[in-house]
Each structure stands twice: as C-alpha cells, then as structure tokens.
A protein has these predicted regions:
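Active-site beta3 strand of CheY-like receiver
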Residues: 46-52
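Receiver (REC) domain active-site loop signature in two-component systems and cognate sites
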Residues: 57
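Alpha4 helix (beta4-alpha4-beta5 surface) of REC/receiver domains from two-component response regulators
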Residues: 85-100, 113
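Two-component/phosphorelay signaling modules centered on CheY-like receiver
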Residues: 12-31, 96
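Acidic catalytic/metal-coordinating carboxylates
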Residues: 35-38, 61-64
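C-terminal output helix
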Residues: 106-115
C-alpha cells in the first residue's frame, strides 16, 4: 500500500526538486500544496502521512501549519525543508512537532538518511 506524501512549498520548482530527491524505490502517493491552507486541507483528506513543509509561504506559512496540526491534534511526520537555517527557526519547528529540519536545496542522500532515521523507509 502506498504511503501518502505531501510536498508543501509555494515554489513549484522547489516541489519538483524535492519530489525528484525522494527514493525511487519508495512506494508513495505524492500530493502537492502551494500554501499552508492547501496543506491542511490535503492533510485532512488523508494525503499526508509524511509532510515535507516549507516555512516561508503566502496565505499560511509553515509555522502556521505546524500550529494548526498541533491544535487539532493531527499526527503527521513533518519534515521541514527550508532555506531559513537560523537556529531559532530550527528550534521552534522542532518544538512545534516537526521530526526533522532539512536545509534547501535538498539532496536525495539527505532525504534518504532522514527517512531511514525515522523508519519511514
């Protein structure tokens, strides 16, 4: 059975690059969202057992998504993928429930290592 994956970023190019970085043998069903509101809707529709989440987006940013997931007690493995590498941002997302923080641009090796670390693949 395919694992539902949600890639959330306001940049279509960034979403495409991240999707290309996913392990080719990984049995997944990939959905995409361009902002935080779309991400929450996709999550509620069952499309996000694992979510790759950008922080800086219009409408609702990644912090807002994490807060909404926490308030609604929704469980998803959230991996934040962001160019914002400030330690404060990293600490904040981890405190809000993210399982990992990956710096953009992503690499296939780094994504695989994070997924293996958390037993996703």
């Amino acid at each position: 059975m395919s694992l539902p994956i949600l890639v959330v970023d306001d940049s279509a190019m960034a979403r495409k690059m991240l999707i290309k970085s996913l392990p080719p043998e990984w049995d997944v069903e990939i959905s995409q969202a361009g902002n935080g509101v779309e991400a929450i809707e996709a999550y509620r529709a069952g499309k996000a057992a694992v979510m790759f989440l950008d922080l800086t987006m219009p409408v609702l940013d990644g912090f807002g998504v994490l807060e909404a997931l926490r308030k609604e007690d929704l469980n998803s493995m959230v991996i934040v993928v962001s160019a914002d590498i400030q330690p404060v941002a990293q600490e904040r997302v981890m405190a809000m429930g993210a399982i990992a923080f990956v710096k953009k641009p992503v690499s296939a090796e780094l994504i695989s290592n994070v997924l293996k670390q958390y037993g996703v693949i």
